[in-house]
Amino acid sequence: MGITFFAILLRIISNSMSNVYQKQLTAKAIDPFLINFIMYLGLTICCIPIIIRTTFLTFPHQIWTNAILGGMCGALGNSYLVKALKNGELSILGPINAYKSVVAMIFGIILLHEIPSITGLVGIILIICGSYFVFDTQEEGFSFKLLKRKDIRYRFYALIFTAIEAVFVKNVILYSDIKISFMFWSFFGMVFTGILLLPKLTNLTSLNQILTTKKFIFTRLLPVSYTHLTLPTNSLV
């Protein structure tokens, strides 16, 4: 219980720090796909010791299937997250992340057949009630009019994809362990974000952006990578 509580606390702190760094990067007009690719690349490099000691041929197909699907959802989710941060305010976008547990619970019931406890249901009710007071401070109020805002829409897209990703990540953990799950999460996130980034690399402006901002990238994106080191350990929170 103590380790779980510490991991959740670290998850909350690291996620907040990551959002701040990502916001700084988008302020420099750096492409969201590039931000996420470098993040996943940094994490994959951190996983090299695990990769060297891993015998991949022994893994069942369930691990590969869930890891690939999780990588696809993660690449899309994190890219939408950065787009949301580019257009919105952290004070408004942050509380939306609380809904991730709600969405993850729904997909957990469908894909993992997990039934939430009474405590979990009470927590979800508190999340919804709390978000009412946050969004009620906006001009649109707590209503579907909020979805007309681009930043809110992007944040909900990110929430849905990362919540689905969390279910796939948990499946990988169930078939292996946290270290293997983290390795696959980082690697396939890098692969699929790289695929999304490829069309942009044909643009000379994008290439010039990478070259001219490389110092800023490495002083801001590496911290983003490090703050994500705790994410897969508590994917569903």
Question: Model-found features: residue ranges?
Answer:
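Glycine-/small-residue-enriched transmembrane alpha-helix faces in small-molecule transporters
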Residues: 1-33, 144-180, 187-188
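Structural signature of hydrophobic alpha-helical transmembrane segments
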Residues: 2-13, 60-73, 118-128, 180-188
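Residue-level signature of transmembrane alpha-helical cores of multipass secondary-active transporters
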Residues: 7-8, 66-67, 82, 124, ...
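Hydrophobic/small/kink-forming positions within alpha-helical transmembrane segments
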Residues: 16, 71, 75, 102-106, ...
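C-terminal ends of transmembrane helices
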Residues: 18-28, 75-92, 134-143, 196-206
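Hydrophobic/aromatic residues within transmembrane alpha-helices
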Residues: 25, 35, 84, 110-112, ...
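Hydrophobic transmembrane alpha-helices of multi-pass small-molecule transport proteins
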Residues: 42, 47, 106-109, 119-138
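Conserved small/polar residues in nucleotide/adenosyl-binding loops
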Residues: 227-233
